[in-house]
Amino acid sequence: MDYFTQQLINGLVLGSIYGLIAIGYTMVYGIVGMINFAHGDVFMIGGFIALITFLLLVSTGLTAVPVILLIVILVSMAITALYGWTIERVAYRPLRHSFRLAPMLSAIGMSFVLTNYSQVAQGARVKPIPPLITGGYTLHESADGFVIQLSNIQIVVVITTIVLLAIFTWLVSRTRLGRDMRACEQDQTMAALLGVDVDRTISMTFVIGAALAAVAGLMYLLYYGLVDFFMGFVAGIKAFTAAVLGGIGSLPGAMLGGLAIGLIETFWSAYFSVEYKDVAAFSILIVVLIFMPTGLLGRPEVEKV
């Protein structure tokens, strides 16, 4: 039971990271009706920006961990948000009214551009980082010596996810931008007729999704202690799977799907072969979609004619 509890903690932490990335996928799909296949690479860019910012701050002699974290979060969110804005302007906006495959192909092309750009700029090797947040708490020690531990970095990941979810929920439900986003989700043409700046709203959707992906990249960097140019592809596919599993277009579903994928991966790695953890996650997705085509929290679309 102690081993199970430890894996439950690990799975929830990993799922929190997937959930933050998945929100970006579901936001864009909910408002634009398209999948941003470059979003995983935006997550990777956020991780690299966090790493570079951290190294620059350390080189100046700054040692206060809270100050370093705050600066890294703000810088990585700001720069990565700019990447999100650029992707929308370059890869999506010119093709928004083209045939449906055009924006998808453009996004895939942008994904390759970002991946290879990062490989050239940062190299193909994994970039490690020394532990920034250490220590933790012992929750329980069994008679056979197994210890249930909750590390400080796990606490930071979970608290950061909860805070960002609360802020984002407030933004969507209580602000003018959130109202515009919900209006565009319902009907872009009608929203434009009612005075909503549709182009600006869609751009802000990409910006917010990229900022959340930047935080996820930072959490990944702190949790695993490394980044590499290929991590965006793997994490992006899993986060997209999480968004579909939870119900693409549903924000709570994106987080629920992220937690589900994180738990499936962690428990499979703990009790079975780690080599097949991805197979297990995608198999669960297939089973869920067979019986629930819209995902766990997705709503069926009804088109009136």
Kindly give the residue locations of the regions a language model identified:
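Alpha-helical transmembrane segments within multi-pass membrane transporters and channels
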Residues: 60-110, 117, 256-261, 292
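Inter-helical junctions in multi-pass inner-membrane proteins, predominant
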Residues: 2-17, 124, 171-176, 202-242, ...
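Helix-loop-helix "hairpin" substructures at the membrane interface of multi-pass membrane proteins
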Residues: 14, 146-228, 251-256
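Pore- or pathway-lining transmembrane helices of multi-pass membrane proteins that form conduits
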Residues: 41-45, 94-119, 232-244, 260, ...
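Membrane-embedded helix boundary and interhelical linker motif in transport proteins
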Residues: 31-86, 90, 147, 247
